[in-house]
């Protein structure tokens, strides 16, 4: 084993347990973090937060959510443009809801459960969206950005964004659009649409 010396003079508490370690780069659009209960030093590609372990677990749950990734896809000036990671200042300025005691406990339970089953993150996503008080249509928008915008950035012309939608999806889109136009202009206006197969006469 090798002993490492911490030469940092300011904010040395970030290396003391318990602390949250945040990776500035992502894995398939998800940002990774971990709560450590032992002292550790790390390099410039990792960020550290020292604090109460319950709050650190809560932050880790929020950071691992699609809400966190969605926010930075839309607001970050470099991610998906010239760099494949976030800058420290961008992470520190992320708006995060202040939890109450019950929400802290729930976040800790989710965090502990994901330690044993990291792929079962449904509870994490639901918790994060509830914390931000997101409506159903806002959740759809978040999923679409991750599933299509990020996927296009990652896979380019192999992205699912280029796959032809199913007939049912076209019909659902038409019904939604017709409903919006009817609510906007009133029932007195008649709207109709046609679904073309092949090249559309436009």
Q: Which residues are covered by each model-predicted region?
A:
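Non-catalytic DNA-recognition/assembly elements of restriction-modification systems
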Residues: 98-202
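Polybasic, glycine- and aromatic-enriched phosphate-binding surface used to engage nucleic acids
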Residues: 1-104, 171-202
């Amino acid at each position: 084993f090798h002993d490492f010396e911490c030469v940092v003079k300011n904010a040395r508490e970030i290396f003391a347990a318990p602390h949250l370690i945040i990776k500035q780069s992502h894995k398939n659009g998800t940002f990774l973090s971990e709560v450590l209960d032992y002292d550790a030093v790390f390099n410039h590609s990792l960020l550290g937060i020292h604090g109460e372990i319950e709050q650190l677990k809560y932050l880790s749950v929020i950071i691992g959510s699609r809400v966190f990734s969605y926010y930075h896809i839309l607001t970050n000036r470099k991610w998906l443009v010239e760099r494949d990671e976030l800058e420290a200042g961008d992470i520190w300025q992320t708006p995060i809801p202040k939890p109450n005691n019950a929400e802290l406990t729930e976040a800790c339970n989710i965090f502990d459960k994901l330690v044993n089953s990291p792929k079962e993150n449904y509870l994490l996503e639901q918790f994060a969206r509830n914390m931000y008080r997101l409506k159903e249509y806002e959740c759809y928008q978040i999923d679409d950005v991750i599933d299509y915008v990020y996927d296009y950035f990652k896979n380019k012309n192999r992205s699912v964004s280029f796959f032809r939608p199913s007939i049912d999806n076209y019909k659902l889109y038409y019904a939604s659009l017709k409903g919006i136009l009817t609510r906007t202009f009133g029932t007195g206006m008649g709207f109709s649409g046609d679904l073309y197969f092949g090249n559309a006469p436009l």
